Amino acid sequence: MKLESTRQGKRLVPGDEFFATSQYFSSFYYNDSHYEPLLGFLKDVRDQGQYGKFEIAIENDLPHAGKDVKFERHALLMEEPEESQWFFQNDMVDYASDPEKSHVVFQVQTGKGKTKCALKTVVRRQKRMMLITKSSFLDKWAGDITTNLKLKPGEFYRVKSGSQLEGLIDMAKDGKLDGRVGAKMIAISSHLIEGYINGYLESGGPVAPWELLKVLGIGGIVYDESHMLFRMNYWSAMFLNPAYILDLTATIIPSNEFEEARFLERFPMEARYDKLAYEPISDVYAIYYGMRDHKKVSRINRMRMYNHTEFEKILFKGTKETQDYYELIDSIMQPWYFKDRKDGMKCLVFFGLVESCKDFAKWLDRKYPKLKVRTYNAGDNYDATIKADVIVSTTGKAGTAIDIPGLLLTVLTVPVDKKSTNLQILGRGRKDQIWGKTPVMAYLVCRNIGKHVHYHRQRMSLFKGCVKKHIVLNSSRMV
């Protein structure tokens, strides 16, 4: 919703990162839930006369219904049989497809098929839709969309730049999105939409953000992992004014009271689908180890705020320490990955630095030349990555939203503070339907580093009820 004062040039209410003010338009933009408090505030200011006399103009922009489309060639099983392990998805899709609902949040744990349910909902709603997510997740989504919806060229657009978005707008104005082969899905990153909105607020443009979906014929938005880049997704939902929103997120866990309030605004309780009980899938092991170099330990413990990338830079300066650290990871892989390994079984290893990922991948490749080892970071191909035996990545790249079939071991070398990130990484392991094995997540804890121990204790509490077992192992290994 947009609220404008007719008195030009006055910012009657200060903005912060969850609000937007524009001197160019003398406007104030906000979430619907703030309407009554803000209107009351403006009336008080007006009545007090401190800004002189002014009128308050209220505009209620109704969302655009969107272009009707059909997905005739899709490859989705729209109704799961009662004996299927995915039978519960029918209720999810029915809930999200209800024409009376304008906002649905799939608050469902990883591995329950949110992507498939979202695509089934898209098919059921029969509207041209937009997908918004992190740019690093778009490769995976492009594959899911083309594979499951069987879209031809001209039916699916992946927007990679501002100039491409401008080109798409021009095509829409010329009617080229509505031809014989009309657009059905448009995928774009949260950052790109953010840039478009900011550009308009700063200097204007041919199409206002709240008119964009009307111009493109978009009838709804699917937000994947909408808790990530949260402020961006909060803004775009506010500015784009979609007729329908489907949020996909397993972890709506606020870090503080302010974030909790914003989460309730962006993910209202009445919109959340949270009927499914959490099913523990994995075993978790905390692996304690020690550091020999007391000077390095002291330097790390003196950090005002713990930074794991700095930890890796300090630790990996020594050749012996690097070798010992890699052998520690290898010792974790021996019982839970290499023992009884079959084709198709996979392992995922997390580091803090991209360079650490590359270096460990080379080390592992030299030690096990028959093993397919790949890194997955910026520039690495998603389809090629998931075919590897061992994948080495950062938590920012592979910690969320990617599915790795056959993943049985996740090794986390990074002490993570954020609750949602820990749960997302835990969720990388999925129920094994092939070999009957329990997925394992193993994380490292340096007993000499205070923050490592602190984050471990937080995980012990956080993972209660979310894992089959959580065991602490004291290793004698030193690095």
Label each region the model flagged.
Residues A378-L462:
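Conserved RecA-like P-loop NTPase helicase motor core
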